Amino acid sequence: MAIPTLNNYAMPSQWKANKVNWSLDPKRAALLIHDMQEYFTAFYGENSPLIAALTEQLAAVRKQCKALGIPVFYTAQPKDQSPEDRALLNDMWGSGLNKSPELQQVVAALRPEPDDT
């Protein structure tokens, strides 16, 4: 089974009030950009308004985090995964990036910078 084509949807324009009253402490925070690889975003189709909005917002969050000294980390699946390494992923999502290694890169606007991890 592979990931199906996914539908676009509107990003929220307003956020609900926070449930807690604490503030973010930049010295104890990190930003994780998870699986923003071309392989995954492609399931929303070319020129997806959702992916464009998401990428723009994530780029703004990353910029603010860097200004505050918050480290940025990325997850990204490798292009060559053995069936043993993929394990349950094969059962759920098929062969993944093994079929499309050219799509391994993180989307251009969010590619890791030299000081990212």
Task: Show where each model-derived region lies.
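Active-site acidic carboxylates
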Residues: 1-115
